[in-house]
From Swiss-Prot:
Species for this entry: Burkholderia pseudomallei (strain 1710b)
Protein name: Chaperone SurA
Keywords: Chaperone, Isomerase, Periplasm, Repeat, Rotamase, Signal
Encoding gene (name): surA
Taxonomic lineage from the root: Bacteria, Pseudomonadati, Pseudomonadota, Betaproteobacteria, Burkholderiales
GO molecular function: peptide binding; peptidyl-prolyl cis-trans isomerase activity; unfolded protein binding
EC number(s) on file: 5.2.1.8
Length: 448
């Protein structure tokens, strides 16, 4: 059941992406928008259009989600501008995917929806009911799942598959983490405001962007300024709706100019000068520092002692039969049944004779679906049925410990970190080039 660790390019994060980009709203919300502007064309994207109805659906959903999260909702014009820009980028990518012959069949979509339901501890019909209760028609949610899968395949083809990481880069990365200051290295949580100005743009356009960025910098430096609100309303980055929050980043994953700029800042301070990056200008605020969480900065890894019960599909059992049997077994275990005895009796894995015990597992030694589920469990907790390429599993975590990582494991972690950083930058560059080479006309006046 274990597998060899291998480098995989950055995944698209389907669950988060679906939640973020699903454009559907309830019929009641649609009626509230009014019919007069519903079918007005708000943007032309090559040979396609985006209508006012589509834009209002997306804006309404995002606004409601922000309200549910008790997060500030940007002014309507600003939110519409940001959402319309996201929709334009999405539409351009869908067109490119179709031109490339990328298709996603129904079986793949259904399997993905099943995994989403499983990740939420539900069966598919329960998950469907939950989505619809949130005001999102199921057929549109399925359509968005198909679109996200298509864009993920497009990114893999056009960007991720072309990312390479040399042994020299790995060695350099590890050396930087093992340097004299490695023990005291800190991760940085940053917020930023981005103003687009590609290096190959006309100088006049760069000057205009710089002037705008300088004005925003002065606002950010002003006493009492709300950096998060300013980022939500003015940043041209995709993370603007999150207030420009980049989360915690290791210094090795950030541009050196950014690391140098924030090195002298105290938490809460804004860097007093603009930072020129290849595609624009950055205004950066240091939110906080913490001890490095980067696995490559430490020889320690976390191992998990785990056992499981595996039921294979196709050996006299259908998908639903295997899943239901494990649900019944889990219920008995939670009522005091012996996991080990159930594993010896029912598991179809080679570990059955050991009561399902897989021993101590290091990161990357199991298939991703198994590892993700395992990592969410507390000691002693038993998972819901988890689907992998092998069948359905019940997983129980018995304990965790810190262990010395092998040289190969450290190299794998470093290679993954470098690959992720390079893939994100390459994707950003590719997306910008795709946007610049497309015909886009905004028909509805929106704030910029």
């Amino acid at each position: 059941m274990k597998k060899t660790l291998r480098f995989a390019a950055v995944a698209s994060g389907l669950v988060a992406s679906l939640i973020t980009v699903a454009p559907s709203a309830s019929a009641q919300a649609l009626r509230a928008q009014g019919a007069s502007l519903a079918d007005e064309v708000v943007a032309v994207v090559n040979n396609d259009v985006i209508t006012g109805r589509e834009l209002d659906q997306r804006v309404g959903l995002i606004a409601r989600r922000l309200q549910q999260q008790k997060a500030p909702v940007p002014p309507t014009d600003q939110l519409r501008a940001q959402v319309l820009n996201q929709m334009v980028l999405e539409r351009i990518q869908v067109q490119r995917a179709k031109d490339d012959g990328i298709v996603v069949d129904n079986a793949t979509v259904q399997a993905t929806l099943g995994r989403l339901a499983q990740a939420n501890g539900m069966q598919l019909d329960q998950y469907k009911a939950r989505i619809e209760a949130q005001g999102v028609p199921w057929d549109l949610f399925v359509r968005d799942a198909r679109t996200e899968l298509m864009l993920s395949k497009l990114r893999e083809k056009e960007v991720d598959s072309k990312i390479t990481v040399s042994d020299a880069e790995v060695a350099s990365y590890i050396a930087s983490q093992r340097g004299p200051n490695a023990g005291s290295q800190q991760d940085l949580r940053l917020e930023h405001i981005f103003v687009k100005a590609p290096a190959n743009a006309p100088q006049a356009d760069i000057d205009v962007a710089q002037k705008k960025a300088e004005g925003l910098l002065q606002q950010a430096l002003a006493s009492g300024a709300n950096f998060e609100r300013l980022a939500k309303n003015q940043s041209e980055a995709d993370d603007a709706k999150k207030g420009g929050d980049l989360g915690f980043k290791s210094p090795a994953s950030l541009p050196s100019d950014v690391v140098d700029a924030v090195s002298k800042l105290r938490p809460g301070e804004v860097n007093p000068t603009l930072i020129r990056v290849p595609d624009g200008f950055e205004i950066v605020r240091l939110v906080e520092r913490r001890a490095s969480q980067n696995p490559a900065a430490s020889p320690k890894i976390v191992q998990t002692h785990v056992r499981h019960i595996l039921l294979r599909v196709g050996e006299g059992k259908s998908e639903s039969q295997a899943r239901q049997q494990l649900i019944d077994i889990r219920r008995q275990i939670e009522s005091g049944g012996d996991f080990e005895k159930f594993a010896r009796t029912y598991s179809q894995d080679g570990s059955a004779s050991q009561g399902g015990d897989l021993g101590w597992i290091s990161p990357g030694e199991t298939v991703p679906e198994f590892e993700r589920a395992m990592n969410t469990l507390q000691d002693g907790q038993v998972s819901n049925p988890v689907r992998t390429e092998y069948g359905y599993h019940l997983i129980q975590v018995l304990g965790r410990r810190d262990a010395e990582g092998s040289v190969q494991q450290q190299m794998d972690i470093a290679r993954q970190a470098i690959g992720q950083r390079k893939a994100e930058q390459a994707y950003s560059d590719w997306l910008r080039e795709l946007r610049d080479s497309s015909y886009v006309q905004i028909k509805l006046p929106v704030a910029q």
